[in-house]
Amino acid sequence: MWVSGVSNYPLPCSSNFLRRFNGGREVGALGFRADTLETYRANEVESEAAKKKKVVIVGSGWPGLGAAHHLSKQGFDVTLLQATSCSGSLVTGQKNAAAPSSEIGIPGFRCPYHNIFCLIDELGIQPFTKWTKSAQYSPEGVEVETPIFQDLPRLPTPLGALFYPLFPHLPSVDRLTSVPLLSAVIDFDNTDVAWRKYDMMTARELFKQLGCSERLYRNALNPLLLVGLFAPGEQCSSAATLGMLSYFFAHQQDFDVVYCRGVVGEKIFKPWMESIKMNGCRFLENRKVTDFLLDGTTGNILEVVCGNEKFLADSVVLALGISDLQQIIMNSSVLQMREEFLNVLNLRAIDVVTVRLWLDRKVKIPKASNTCSGFNDSMGWAFFDLTLLHDEYKDEPGTVIEADFYHANQFLPLKDEVIVGKVKSYLARCINEFEVAAVVDQVVVRFPKSVTHFFPGSYKYMLRGSTGFSNLFMAGDWIITRHGSWSQEKAYVTGLEAANRVIDYLGEGKFARIIAVEEDEPHVQALRSLGRNINDLRTQSQSTILTFIFFEEKSVSSVHIQ
């Protein structure tokens, strides 16, 4: 110990100290060769590292980086394993020999993404556009024009969403049929009871039961599901639908959106990963997890296996999408031991196809962000003017468009040229100027089974943040959480929740601060409280009636016996 104490002080370089040489190497006055002192220092560093608890995170993107971000700041020895050589799932760049870098999917960042915006402030970066107006198209033209809600006088929920957007083809009488939907949104409080109550029913059935008009469903509600839950209403869980609606429409401004001014992987993930690396986290690429080894005494995960490599772990976080986790489960004898992981094999994911087009001229597009429906019964899509959204395309001589297609299984087998032809035809039906513009370059990227499908009945197969292995935790946008957020914000929050579970399990470090979803407006809280009281009274009444019937039958039986 005294040697390590000496090595913490600056060593003098005078001839009195370096007065002897041995084999051409300097030897200090204490009798230690300089290289020996360096060895002591290295051993001391290794000893300190060995004392740190080891956490292995599998998967990057918002959940994996979120967990790594906090745990590395708490001094844990964190290793993040990536199956590929690029991080960020659907939001990193793709290189194509015929075109500049192309991004897979253009994610929006909604007003209630408070935890993500807090992270951006912490990183000291400015990756976002200003708040952006949007439009929704059908083959008949513009169906909805959405303003920036926070710029308008605030109305009680849901009045702002009903009256501020422009609905050229949707009469007020149809819009008003959505009001009964508020009762279901209020009844859905994101508890386990609420999810199980609504999950088996399709969104289409729910809207029909509540009296929503067919035109409202066709022109507004179903298009929202196609780009929000990536599937048509008859294939969406009504519980997931209510969860999404209650998050994005709880307050007038919640649907406002900004976009990244470039590839998310470059603008956000790259500086974020550099920050995490500075905290000591290791990023290892091209490491596909094949199995786990268990501690024979505790039954906990002892090592993460990647082919011939093994990584010791005091705790493990799986921050993966459904398809990636299913692949691991299919290979892992350890995960196959648990029913909860076998249940994951019942879940499904949705295909995405993204198309980026470089046009030979400028096309005037009223809104930079646009969603579309009605061109295909089961497929939703969105298109974006990247010359307005992305910095790198501002000086392009022609317009650069990205079109992202969800539930795009019908596009997967088609050749690129066929897909591009269809996309160009769809765009021309939205905006006439696309018809005369020529495509000078293109990138088509297919992502089969890449986003979560919240189908009716899926809730019972989904995992919670904690698992049957006491040191194995989950994160991702499909993991059950009571936070109430959605999409990227939910993915990031579950990463922080996983980090907090690791800290709680290992008994070290400070918990991550997670910003709660903003409280409901007072009238919504009052209605929700009233609904709970009515449900409680209904339950008590049913219990009283059943008790009365039981004692009546018992009394009658006693009389017969006598």
Regions found by a protein language model. Name each.
Residues 2-55, 73-74, 521-562:
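Extreme N-terminal leader/targeting segments of oxidoreductases
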Residues 50-51, 177-303, 307, 312:
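Active-site/ligand-binding neighborhood in enzyme catalytic cores
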Residues 250, 254-257, 302-305, 313-315, ...:
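C-terminal segments that line or cap access tunnels to active or ligand-binding sites in enzymes
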Residues 98-194:
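Dinucleotide-binding Rossmann-like beta1-alpha1 core, especially the glycine-rich loop
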Residues 50-80:
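N-terminal Rossmann-like FAD-binding beta1-loop-alpha1 element of flavoenzymes
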Residues 72-96:
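Glycine-rich FAD pyrophosphate-binding loop
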Residues 63, 86, 323:
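Conserved Rossmann-like nucleotide-cofactor binding loop
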